[in-house]
Curated annotation (Swiss-Prot):
Alphabetical list of NCBIfam families matching this protein: crcB
Binding residues annotated for Na(+), in chain numbering: 74, 77
Name of protein: Fluoride-specific ion channel FluC
Principal localisation: membrane
Gene: fluC
Lineage: Bacteria, Bacillati, Cyanobacteriota, Cyanophyceae, Oscillatoriophycideae
Keyword terms of this UniProt record: Cell inner membrane, Cell membrane, Ion channel, Ion transport, Membrane, Metal-binding, Sodium, Transmembrane, Transmembrane helix, Transport
Source organism of the structure: Gloeothece citriformis (strain PCC 7424)
Regulation: Na(+) is not transported, but it plays an essential structural role and its presence is essential for fluoride channel function.
Single biological process term from Gene Ontology: cellular detoxification of fluoride
Subcellular localization: Cell inner membrane
Length: 123
């Protein structure tokens, strides 16, 4: 039961953080549709790299992984918004923007995850 509560709490906090980040990006960059989603996905990728690496090194309790990786990152990051935004770009015939957004999201997502892992290994 504790595991479910940890995922629930982390997911709720992650969802709130995603909402607030989206609002912040909309205020400061109103003409860039996907910046909020891009930002949370990259930050979430970095966090999950750190958290899982710290757990794998036995520096953190695996229950922290349920709270932060499964819960928070699960609520914070969003593949569905990424997919929707790409669909909107394609409907507007913005093929280059859709392609660029996809490539940049994948590249920076992997880079952020690897950076988190690297920082823990370097430790």
């Amino acid at each position: 039961m504790l595991e479910i509560l940890l995922v629930f709490l982390g997911g709720g906090l992650g969802s709130i953080a995603r909402y607030l980040m989206g609002q912040l990006m909309t205020i400061h960059f109103p003409n860039i549709l996907s910046l909020g989603t891009f930002t949370v996905n990259i930050i979430g990728s970095f966090i999950i790299g750190l958290v899982i690496s710290l757990i794998n090194k036995n520096q953190w309790n695996p229950q922290i992984g349920l709270l932060l990786a499964t819960g928070f990152c699960g609520g914070f990051t969003t593949f569905s918004s990424f997919s929707y935004e790409n669909t909107a770009y394609l409907k507007n015939n913005d093929y280059l923007l859709s392609f660029g957004y996809t490539i940049m999201s994948l590249f920076w997502g992997f880079a952020a995850t690897f950076l988190g892992i690297y920082l823990v290994k370097r430790g």
